[in-house]
Amino acid sequence: MISFTNLSRYTDIGSNCYLLDMDGVRIVLDSGMHPKKDGAEATPEFNLIGAADPDTIFITHSHLDHIGTLPVLQDKYPAAEVNMTAATCEVGLAMLHNSVNVMTAKRTQEGIIDYPFYTHMELDHVARCWMPRPYG
């Protein structure tokens, strides 16, 4: 049996995240952060993943609406394998570190207490688990 679940909180572009279940193999596709929302409202609805943990996470590319909450997802499901291209690993890490800076500034300037979702140290820790895959 195959099921496809949209974990995105909204129907517009942003917080892209999907669960593909194929005969019990559970794959999360992307883990984005919505660019026009703040705090928890910017995240996918990870609670829809359900009781069974995902087996793997696949990131399509390094735009924040596809990778922005990956460290949050990894924290919830540390055993899930994380796959992406080598270029996505490199650019994604830089994008996510910049995101920490932006979230930290928003917490200070706008009082958004949910931010930051993760720290630079936490990001570096989870990034060690990323598995770069050849493109093509």
Regions found by a protein language model. Name each.
Residues R9, A87, P134-Y135:
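Residues that form or immediately flank small-molecule/cofactor binding pockets and catalytic motifs
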Residues Y10-G14:
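A short catalytic or substrate-binding loop motif that flags glycine-/basic-rich loops and adjacent residues
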Residues S15, M22-I59, H63-L64, G68-A80, ...:
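Pre-active-site segment of Zn-dependent metallo-hydrolases
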Residues F4-T5, H61:
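N-terminal amphipathic, basic-rich helices that act as targeting or association modules
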Residues L7, L29, R133:
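Hydrophobic residues at beta-strand termini and immediately following loops
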Residues F4, V82, C129-W130:
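Generic structural signal for residues in well-ordered beta-strands
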Residues M1-F4, R26:
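Extreme N-terminal starter segment of soluble prokaryotic enzymes
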Residues A127-Y135:
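Short acidic-hydrophobic, aromatic-tinged amphipathic segments that line or gate anion-handling sites
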